[in-house]
């Protein structure tokens, strides 16, 4: 007997051809050289913002935007890191930057 | 003082009409500023948790408490966080109190479907708890919470008196059982106060609360009309009219409508029975509009909403909408203000509420006297510590507006069972007049505050009712 009939048998089988080095994403790298660097920087900035969210000194982070939380911490004299404000100012309107870590969860 | 002034003038009633009529100009309000801006809400968003209020409350109050702790227990006392506590080491901790009360009404307990026999005597799983006047119990426990941890408290701390949400500093040490043994504790005490400029003439502010319109009782309507007549100078001799001209402002502190206007029987009835009936509050608001028209034609009036008034339920209650008072809003002397109301009248700072904060603390604390509770809120430096826990509150996130930024000169609360007034002193020579304004529909009493001497006097209006047997004493009986 063959193997059990799976629902995926009704779909055509498509196998991706692996590149010689084993990675298929690496093809784009030599053509557009700037992409990985901004991504790394962005990742570093997002990581900075995530650490700001998780810092307990500035109060709860859910339900308010990071900018609101930073301004509240500033008004209360808690001296939040100015780098966070710089990052928030350079990416206005981007929900990955502006909203807190848990904004996808209701309340 | 009011009636003594009145008695000094010559009697002019019961005399033939005179050619010239005496006129009394009302004392002008020299300076008035409404500082209730922190209690005004613009865009409201309820998609936030209440953790923000508690966090900002603790962060804002921490410096005050650390100062007081150093004043009480010496400047060398170590103020530590709960995570830094070492066993058996005496130190001071600042945090928010939480009182675990088994009798506290809990919606989860009400809707829980467990039919397991209750473990403790006071778990009613099947029936909702009937409303009680006090929810305290000898088994209540106090827990201190700071930003990261919580710890149970035991020792010389009055569990029944304190309520959830108070920020305080405790001095003691943590024991082996994990509880903190309290030796002493202190509150933030009174905020700094700017001295009031001295006044040269007597000026009065009339505080009334609990008019209770729409309640169906004719007694209180007579009292209300007498009040309006006295203030507008239509009652009494020239002496009384002269004294009434010294009343520079009237503050109506909440519960303008009666509790019975809130009855929701029409919800349970069928639609065809209730189609043409109006809500009871509509008629009551019309009566209120007429009373406010008479008052605001003569004196500046500030109207604060209360528990039964048509505005939002959560604190801070927003001002009543001017569309409900088409007649009275024609006068600019009518001011519709928020529930915790703050204003500076002739240099004297007034701060007051309609009484929801004090009655909520009354329910969850062993303190019996409303005046004592009012003083306690001032000493704790917070208008309503139970606010998000048992009293509805807007989810603030930036600041907690109920913390006293500075100490008022007159601090009042409305809708208390009886009149009371007291002058208290603070540690930095602050002087505050505390006034508990009684419910007018029950007691027919209002309060007159003298701005020059910061003294308060009750003034009561009563008519002879059918059940009064005082008529016998007047010699009118058979």
From Swiss-Prot, chain A:
Q: Which InterPro entries match?
A: DNA_pol_delta_4 (IPR007218)
In the record, the effect of residue 89 to R is given as: No effect on ubiquitination. Loss of ubiquitination
- UniProt key word Transferase: no
Changing residue 15 to A: what effect? Decreased PCNA binding. No effect on PCNA binding, but normal degradation after UV irradiation. Increased stability following UV irradiation and no trough during S phase
The subcellular localization recorded is: Nucleus
Annotated consequence of substituting residue 74 to R: No effect on ubiquitination. Loss of ubiquitination
> Changing residue 17 to A does what?
Increased stability following UV irradiation and no trough during S phase
GO cellular-component terms in the record? delta DNA polymerase complex; nucleoplasm
**Mutation effect (residue 4 to R):** No effect on ubiquitination. Loss of ubiquitination
Domain of life (superkingdom): Eukaryota
Annotated signal peptide:
none
Question: Which keywords accompany this UniProt record?
Answer: DNA damage, DNA excision, DNA repair, DNA replication, Nucleus, Ubl conjugation
Bias (Basic and acidic residues) occurs at 15-28
Location of the region described as Disordered in the Swiss-Prot/TrEMBL record: 1-44
Predominant location category: nucleus
Provide the record's note on post-translational modification. Ubiquitinated; undergoes 'Lys-48'-linked ubiquitination in response to UV irradiation, leading to proteasomal degradation. This modification is partly mediated by RNF8 and by the DCX(DTL) E3 ubiquitin ligase complex (also called CRL4(CDT2)). Efficient degradation requires the presence of PCNA and is required for the inhibition of fork progression after DNA damage.
Gene Ontology BP terms:
DNA synthesis involved in DNA repair; DNA-templated DNA replication; positive regulation of endothelial cell proliferation
Q: What would changing residue 4 to Q do, according to UniProt?
A: No effect on PCNA binding, nor on degradation after UV irradiation. No effect on PCNA binding, but normal degradation after UV irradiation
Spell out the family assignment given in the record's similarity comment.
Belongs to the DNA polymerase delta subunit 4 family.
Q: What does this protein do?
A: As a component of the tetrameric DNA polymerase delta complex (Pol-delta4), plays a role in high fidelity genome replication and repair. Within this complex, increases the rate of DNA synthesis and decreases fidelity by regulating POLD1 polymerase and proofreading 3' to 5' exonuclease activity. Pol-delta4 participates in Okazaki fragment processing, through both the short flap pathway, as well as a nick translation system.
Q: How does it assemble?
A: Component of the tetrameric DNA polymerase delta complex (Pol-delta4), which consists of POLD1/p125, POLD2/p50, POLD3/p66/p68 and POLD4/p12, with POLD1 bearing DNA polymerase and 3' to 5' proofreading exonuclease activities. Within this complex, directly interacts with POLD1 and POLD2. Directly interacts with PCNA, as do POLD1 and POLD3; this interaction stimulates Pol-delta4 polymerase activity. As POLD1 and POLD2, directly interacts with WRNIP1; this interaction stimulates DNA polymerase delta-mediated DNA synthesis, independently of the presence of PCNA.
UniProt-recorded name of the protein: DNA polymerase delta subunit 4
Report the source organism.
Homo sapiens (Human)
Q: Which gene codes for it?
A: POLD4
């Amino acid at each position: 007997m063959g193997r059990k009939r799976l629902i995926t048998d009704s779909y055509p089988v498509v196998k991706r051809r692996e590149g010689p080095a084993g990675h298929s994403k690496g093809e784009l790298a030599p053509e557009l050289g700037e992409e990985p660097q901004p991504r790394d920087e962005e990742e570093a900035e997002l990581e900075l913002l995530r650490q700001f969210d998780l810092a307990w000194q500035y109060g709860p982070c859910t339900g308010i935007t990071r900018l609101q939380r930073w301004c509240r911490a500033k008004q209360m004299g808690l001296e939040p890191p100015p780098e966070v404000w710089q990052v928030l100012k350079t990416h206005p309107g981007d929900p990955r930057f502006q909203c807190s870590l848990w904004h996808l969860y209701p309340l | 003082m009011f009636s003594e002034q009145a008695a000094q003038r010559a009697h002019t009633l019961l005399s033939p009409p005179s050619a010239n009529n005496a006129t009394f100009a009302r004392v002008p309000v020299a300076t008035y500023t409404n500082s209730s801006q922190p209690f005004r809400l613009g865009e409201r968003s309820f998609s936030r948790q209440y953790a923000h209020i508690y966090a900002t409350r603790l962060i804002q109050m921490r410096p005050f408490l650390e100062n007081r702790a150093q004043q009480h227990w010496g400047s060398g006392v170590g103020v530590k966080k709960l995570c830094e506590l070492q066993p058996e080491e005496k130190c001071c901790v600042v945090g928010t109190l939480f009182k675990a009360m088994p009798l506290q009404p809990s919606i989860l307990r009400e809707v829980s479907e467990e039919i397991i026999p209750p473990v403790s005597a006071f778990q009613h799983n099947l029936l909702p708890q009937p409303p009680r006047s006090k929810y305290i119990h000898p088994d209540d426990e106090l827990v201190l919470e700071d930003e990261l941890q919580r710890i149970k408290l035991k020792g010389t701390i009055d569990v029944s008196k304190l309520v959830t949400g108070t920020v305080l500093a405790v001095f003691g040490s943590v024991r082996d059982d994990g509880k903190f043994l309290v030796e002493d504790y202190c509150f933030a005490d009174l905020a700094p106060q700017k001295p009031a400029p001295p006044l040269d003439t007597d000026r009065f502010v009339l505080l009334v609360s609990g008019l209770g319109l729409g309640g169906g009782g004719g007694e209180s309507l007579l009292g209300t009309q007498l009040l309006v007549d006295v203030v507008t100078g239509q009652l009494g001799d020239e002496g009384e009219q002269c004294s009434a001209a010294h009343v520079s402002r009237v503050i109506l502190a909440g519960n303008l409508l009666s509790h019975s206007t809130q009855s929701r029987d029409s919800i349970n009835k069928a639609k065809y029975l209730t189609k043409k009936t109006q809500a009871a509050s509509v008629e009551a608001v019309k009566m209120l509009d007429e009373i406010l028209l008479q008052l605001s034609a003569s004196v500046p009036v500030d109207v604060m909403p209360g528990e039964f008034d048509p505005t939002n339920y959560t604190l801070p209650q927003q001002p009543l909408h001017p569309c409900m008072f088409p007649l009275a809003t024609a006068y600019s002397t009518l001011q519709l203000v928020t529930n915790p109301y703050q204003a500076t009248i002739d240099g004297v700072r007034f701060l007051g509420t309609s009484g929801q904060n004090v009655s909520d603390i009354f329910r969850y604390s062993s303190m019996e006297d409303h005046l004592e509770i009012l003083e306690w809120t001032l000493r704790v430096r917070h208008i309503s510590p139970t606010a998000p826990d048992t009293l509805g509150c807007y989810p603030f996130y930036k600041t907690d507006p109920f913390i006293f930024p500075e100490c008022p000169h007159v601090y009042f609360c409305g809708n208390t069972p009886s009149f009371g007034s007291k002058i208290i002193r603070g540690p930095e020579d602050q002087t505050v007049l505390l006034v508990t304004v009684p419910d007018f529909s029950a007691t027919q009493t209002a309060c007159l505050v003298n701005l020059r001497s910061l003294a308060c006097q009750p003034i009561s209006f009563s008519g002879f009712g059918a059940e009064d047997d005082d008529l016998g004493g007047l010699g009118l009986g058979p």
